[in-house]
């Protein structure tokens, strides 16, 4: 089974692997400052770990490649400015590096979710990575005018030992 992850160009994935936030102090933190209310890298990592143990070692992925429409041109820019990598979850699991998988449903599927709830995404722990849905994602629901770029589509967060997915578990797809 695969998940798809995007990283802005240029990047060092072929040499360093995919880094979680806990392993990437050079990450652009502007989004996380707003999201967490923290003012330092260390504070952001602590905030993530308060969400649940291992959260700072999480790496987001989609069950299929991202697709843009005329209503979601920001996704087109995102895709065109990034390298897409597939993550081999079977091998990660077989080698004991996959600690947990969480599912973030579309906000459309969570009627009790309030718009002002912006502290962290809703994450539901899956029993096993084989519980990842293989149903097609409805990318047409993404709309730049509504904001929340990926809130309308389901995605996954894999918690990885050490916070790094080594290069041998990933394939550059574009």
Language model feature labels by segment:
Residues 83-174:
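Active-site and NAD+-binding cores of ADP-ribose-processing enzymes
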Residues 57-67:
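A short, exposed loop/beta-hairpin motif centered on an aromatic-Gly-Thr core
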């Amino acid at each position: 089974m695969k998940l798809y992850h995007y990283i802005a160009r240029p990047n060092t994935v072929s040499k360093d692997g995919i880094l979680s936030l806990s392993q990437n102090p050079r990450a652009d933190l502007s989004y996380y400052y707003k999201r967490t209310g923290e003012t330092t890298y260390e504070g952001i990592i602590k905030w993530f770990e308060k969400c649940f143990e291992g959260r700072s070692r999480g790496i987001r992925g989609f069950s299929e490649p991202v697709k843009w429409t005329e209503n979601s041109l920001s996704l087109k820019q995102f895709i065109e400015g990034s390298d897409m990598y597939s993550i081999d979850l079977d091998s990660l699991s077989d080698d004991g590096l996959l600690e947990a998988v969480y599912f973030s449903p579309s906000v459309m599927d969570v009627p009790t979710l309030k718009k002002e709830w912006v502290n962290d995404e809703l994450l539901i722990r899956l029993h096993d990575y084989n519980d990842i849905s293989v149903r097609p994602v409805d990318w047409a629901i993404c709309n730049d005018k509504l904001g929340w770029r990926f809130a309308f589509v389901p995605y996954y967060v894999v918690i990885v030992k050490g916070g790094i997915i080594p290069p041998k578990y990933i394939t550059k797809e574009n």
